[in-house]
């Protein structure tokens, strides 16, 4: 985060921005805040009113917790809703949230959660255990077709209900014996369950509010709009102006409302990181979502106290569509694309050492020893790194998100593949929504992609490439891989479980439907008067814990 010394600020009445988004925001923001005096920046005026101004990179696709799939959507959703648990930002360990305690049976198959007695929806209605039961049944309903339903598959009969094998949702392994108790019965032991329960797909929804707008499994209904959304988190939805701003107001019904100093949060969907950095310098943001790598050195030299480079449990990789081109159906071709990549050079020259090169999909975490692709030297020595003889050589397309980093990484890969393999690769830049859609529909050959851990366990990365995973957009499927993860799921001894996960990762890297590139880092600018901004390896923060310095 940039250390600010004598950076120039635009006075409040004549805000200057570099895009129509920021111009629209500057005008709208003045209506949200209580006004600002001459020479006062939006950040200064916002601080006086307890308003936090945040860059958030992209317009939300959906604020339905059961349907959201992007980090930028879920950052907002996590402020609107709350599950049974929440993860500590720094340690990633589960903490009590809607539940104040829980216990597990000796066989690891039955978990009992005890809800707090002071839970309310934002409209004042009491929130009880039955709300969680109905919400999880909704998330698993095949009519909703929620991609994230798979996170609930640890529940007994969840897969059977989601697949239509059974029709009665009461057979799913969750019951509410009373208003403040939830009993979860699992298909297999899941020691990571308390962390898993912090994900948005496990959040409760106000059933009557959903049904007011039609069947609760209908998508795109207006219950997620301002004035209609009923939530249970620290904030409520006050304003949603598409492509301009989302404003959250403190929820007075939340159990910890009295302790939250941040009264209001304004999220700005500024997709261009250069525009976002300029907005920060102009005093329009308390914190950016990211920072162009080309600006890191400048901020390190001139304003290091405002520059934050924090570890992120995130993996960036090349996604290969094995069904998109005959050459890509060959594992030898995919391995050649991977081994032609000089990851050290990529990290040093393109990423300016802000990210670590990756030779595995899973970042280092806990007691897990990640698998690793072979070194380039070893692969070339045994000949497995050569491009299979294809006449003519394939001409491939690489799709990337149009941010400040992916195109630069793509250009480096393009040059490496041309030099090492003699193949031509074109680069197509896309805005985030289209970039995601083309991966989902298989409309790509090569793609730069990334995954941020949902919970602190290797499985959060490895389960992406199960044959039936809704996020396995590679066209690759392996019964052996599926079997290894299934064995790990039923293995209670920690070391043996991790060994099976490592074996699965080794198989994945050898088959190469993906090629690891580098591990993520959260690179931001944070205004000096924001207190309690701690590293968050999973990318989420409880904004209600932040404070404004005097």
PLM regions: where:
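Structural transition elements
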Residues: 352-392, 402-408
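Aromatic- and charge-enriched surface segment that lines or borders ligand/interaction sites
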Residues: 100-151, 183, 276-279, 327-329
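Extracellular/periplasmic solute-recognition and catalytic clefts
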Residues: 238-249, 266-324, 348
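Extracytoplasmic/peripheral linker and loop segments enriched in polar/acidic and small residues
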Residues: 37, 335, 347-348, 423-435, ...
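N-terminal lobe/hinge region of extracytoplasmic solute-binding protein
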Residues: 55-106, 137, 228-231
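Long beta-strand-rich cores associated with HINT superfamily self-processing modules
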Residues: 524-550
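Alpha-helical secondary-structure segments
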Residues: 128-135, 179-185, 233-234, 262-264, ...
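Gly/Pro-rich hinge or "lid" segments in bacterial periplasmic/extracellular proteins
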Residues: 158, 169-171, 175, 179-180, ...
């Amino acid at each position: 985060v940039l250390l600010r010394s004598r950076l120039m600020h635009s006075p409040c009445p004549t805000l200057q921005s570099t895009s129509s988004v920021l111009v629209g925001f500057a005008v709208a923001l003045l209506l949200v805040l209580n006004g600002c005096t001459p020479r006062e920046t939006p950040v200064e005026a916002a601080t006086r009113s307890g308003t936090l101004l945040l860059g958030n990179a992209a317009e939300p696709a959906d604020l339905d917790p059961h349907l959201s799939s992007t980090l930028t959507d879920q950052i907002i959703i996590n402020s609107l809703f709350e599950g049974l648990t929440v993860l500590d930002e720094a340690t990633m360990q589960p903490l009590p949230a809607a539940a104040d305690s829980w216990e597990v049976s000796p066989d690891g198959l039955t978990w009992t959660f005890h809800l707090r007695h002071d839970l309310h929806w934002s409209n004042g209605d009491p929130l009880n255990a039955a709300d969680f039961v109905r919400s999880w049944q909704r998330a698993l309903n095949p009519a909703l077709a929620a991609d994230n339903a798979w996170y609930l598959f640890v529940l007994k009969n969840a897969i059977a209900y989601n697949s239509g094998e059974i029709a009665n949702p009461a057979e799913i392994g969750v019951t509410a014996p009373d208003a403040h108790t939830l009993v979860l019965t699992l298909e297999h032991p899941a020691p990571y369950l308390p962390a898993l329960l912090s994900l948005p797909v496990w959040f409760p929804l106000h059933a009557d509010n959903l049904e007011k707008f039609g069947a609760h499994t209908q998508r795109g209904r207006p219950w997620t709009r301002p004035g209609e959304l009923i939530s249970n988190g620290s904030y409520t939805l006050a304003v949603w102006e598409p492509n301009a701003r989302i404003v959250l107001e403190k929820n007075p019904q939340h159990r910890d409302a009295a302790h939250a100093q941040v009264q209001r949060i304004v999220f700005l969907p500024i997709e261009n990181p250069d525009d976002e950095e300029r907005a920060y310098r102009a005093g329009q943001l308390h914190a950016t979502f990211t920072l162009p790598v080309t600006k890191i050195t400048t901020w390190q030299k001139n304003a290091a106290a405002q520059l934050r480079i924090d570890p992120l449990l995130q993996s960036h990789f090349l996604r290969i569509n094995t069904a998109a081109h005959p050459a890509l159906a060959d594992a030898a071709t995919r391995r050649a694309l991977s081994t032609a990549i000089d990851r050290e050079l990529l990290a040093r020259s393109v990423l300016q050492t802000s990210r670590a090169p990756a030779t595995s999909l899973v970042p280092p975490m806990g007691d897990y020893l990640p698998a690793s692709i072979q070194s380039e030297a070893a692969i070339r020595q045994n000949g497995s790194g050569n491009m299979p003889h294809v006449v003519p050589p394939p001409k491939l397309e690489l799709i990337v998100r149009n941010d400040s980093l992916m195109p630069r990484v793509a250009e480096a890969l393009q040059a490496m593949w041309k030099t090492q393999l003699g193949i031509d690769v074109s680069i197509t830049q896309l805005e985030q929504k289209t970039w995601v859609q083309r991966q989902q529909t298989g409309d790509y050959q090569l793609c730069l992609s990334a995954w941020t851990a949902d919970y602190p366990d290797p499985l959060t990365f490895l389960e992406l490439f199960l044959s039936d995973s809704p996020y396995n957009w590679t066209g690759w499927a392996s019964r052996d891989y599926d079997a290894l993860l299934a064995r790990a799921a039923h293995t209670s001894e920690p070391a043996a479980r991790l060994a099976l996960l490592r074996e699965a990762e080794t198989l994945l890297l050898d088959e190469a439907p993906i090629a690891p590139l580098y591990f993520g880092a959260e690179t931001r600018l944070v205004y000096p008067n924001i207190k309690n901004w701690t590293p968050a390896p999973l990318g989420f923060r409880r904004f209600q814990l932040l404070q404004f310095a005097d």
